Amino acid sequence: MKKIALVIAAMMVSLASHAQFEAGKAYVGASLSGLDLSYSGLTEGKLSVQGKVGYLLVDNIMATAQLSYEKQKDVPYVLSVGAGGRYYIVQNGLYLGASALFKHHKGYNDLLPSVQVGYSFFVSRTVTIEPELYYEQSFKNHSDYSQFGLRIGIGIYLFKDPTQN
């Protein structure tokens, strides 16, 4: 009897998690990196705050847009804007992401492709905690501006578009 109850519970959890990444839902998130959680040639004393919005175009595939602000020890600010996508590999929240970022600070502009792998831990039906590993590749100055690191974020999956089934 316990085995049957466990199988039924597992099926219910997998169905509930499938509903989290269905087409027509919107996403709003914010994340933090830095505090020695990232590395590049120039990131001593770096802190980065990022905002992201997204929309699930089809089940498990999200288009995203992002804006971020970085403060580094020797650089007054770095602003970046980007667009990309996420693919949820498995229904429990594991995802792969790719994006293109445009970074700017006084006297410096760069276009960086970025890849991410992360996990969406659902703490409620719509709210997630999202640890994410990322890599950003600078073509202008690889040794100083390419970086990899860890972001910790929070995400909110909003509505399901009523015009879709």
Listing of model-derived features with the role each one plays in the protein:
Residues 32-36, 100-101, 134-137:
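Extracytoplasmic loops and strand-loop junctions of Gram-negative outer membrane beta-barrel proteins
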